[in-house]
Amino acid sequence: MDQFVITSLREYAERYETETFLFEDPSLFMHKVQGERNQEIIAFIAAGLSYGRRELFFPKIQYVIDCSHGDVEKWILSNDFCKDIPDNNKCYYRLYTNKIINTFIKRIKSMLEEYGSLRQFAISNTKEKDAVTLVEAFTKFFNENEASHVIPKETKSSCKRLCMFLRWMVRTSSPVN
């Protein structure tokens, strides 16, 4: 890597790897709930909804936290989410209907029931510690029977939001993640 790139990356890190940046970043939501599983789940939902203008999608993520009273895992496993995000065609956010988000959350529920947590799913699907294999596993799981429009159908796209979630989950020394 040349010196310009190294210097630029360090400058960006100094600018954006701060607690003040957190208030403008979707990773904020995983700091609003307690417990590793709740943090993983809300981070995954936040990443899935993170496109467009923040002032529009932030309230949709906050709605999940409010409805679940901060216990997103219990809210999902108890099917309480079906009352708050019914299986209908009303718009939830931009191109996503309630039905799309409801189906997305049902797939999260299936993952929790089968693996116990998103982390355990990741561990079970990364034998070589290969990020591409993990992204493929997530896309496959969430698109069985064409169940989800939130997670890309395949890895031919950049899978930007899914990769953002994975970055949040592996970084431990960042004040943002």
Regions found by a protein language model. Name each.
Residues 1-177:
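HhH-family (HhH-GPD) DNA N-glycosylase catalytic core used in base-excision repair
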